[in-house]
Amino acid sequence: MEQNFTTHCDHEFSWDPNRPLVVACSGGLDSVVLTHLMHQYHGHLILAHMNYGLRGVESDQDEAFVAALGADLGYEVVIDRVAPDSVKNQPGMSLQMKARELRYAFFEHVMLSHHAQGVLTAHHADDNLETFLINLSRSTGLKGLTGIKSSTRGVFRPLLPFKRAEILAFAQNKGYTWREDASNQSDDYQRNIIRHHISPGFDKLERPWNQSLRQTQEYLDQAQTLLQDYLDLVSAQVITETEDGLRLDLTALSAHPSPNVLLAGLCREYGLKAGQDVGQLAQAQSGARLYTQTHELLKDRGVILINA
C-alpha cells in the first residue's frame, strides 16, 4: 500500500516539500494510517484534533492518543475543545452537520495560522461509496452522484482510492494502534446502516468496485459539467431581472429539450431542495407558490417569478 500511496500522491498532488500540511487526526484507524503514510511521504506535518466532548472520558482519551502520536512522530499537535452543547440541539442542523461545520472551520484556522498549504482528511473509497448511496437515496441529481473529490479548496484526500479493508490490513501488518469510536457500531445513522448492511455486499463483486465507481463518477462529473454549461446558456435566454426579483419565461424554456429537467436545474440556484417538484408549479394555475430554502417561486401565467 505504501508504494501505491506514493504513486498516487506523486500523480495527483503537487505539494511543496518546504511547507507544512495539516493532517486532520481523530485518532481512528483511517486518520492514524494517513498520518503514518504522510510521515513517510512528506514529513512536514501538523496534526489537528477536535475534541467535541460528546463521549466524555473517551473523547479525552482520543485527544490524549493523538497528542501522544504527534509527540512520537515529532509533530506539533493543535487541539480544539468545544462544549458538547455547541454541537447538540442546533436548530435546523443535525449533530453531524454542526460537528462538520465546526471541524472544518478549525482545520482552516490551523492551516492559515501555520501558513500550511492544505488540510488532509482520511476519506477513503468506502466513504465515497457510502456518500454515493446516500445521495442516490436523496434524489440529489447528477451533482450529488459525482462523489467525494480528491481535492477541494485546499482540502486533500489522498486515501480516496483505497478501500477500508486495505487500510485495516495495512495497519494490522504495521502493528499500528488506534482508537475505536463505539458510536460507529450503531445503526442510528443512515451512513452506518449503509456501512454495516449494504457496502459489504460490494466486496463480493468480482471486479474491484472502487475502480468502477471512480470511473462512473468521472463520467457523471463530465456530464454534470456539460449540463451546467447548457444551463448557463439557457438561463441567459429565459431568466431576466425585474425590479422585485427574477422572471423565468416558461414559454421560452419549453422550446428546449427536457424543459422540466432544465427547470429543476435552474431553480437549484435559488434554493430548490431535492424532492421539491418545480415541474408541478410550472403546470399549476396562476397564483400557485413554492417556497425553497432561500426564495419564493410564484406562478404568474406563462412565467415563474423568483423573489428572495
For the regions a protein language model found, what residue spans apply to each?
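Active-site catalytic microenvironments for nucleophilic, acid-base chemistry
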Residues: 37-41, 113, 201-204, 266-269
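AMP-forming adenylation/ATP pyrophosphatase catalytic core
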Residues: 2-30, 46, 50, 82-84, ...
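Short coil/loop linkers at secondary-structure junctions
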Residues: 14-16, 76, 117, 177, ...
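Catalytic subdomain that performs nucleotidyl-dependent activation
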Residues: 118-122, 127-216, 246
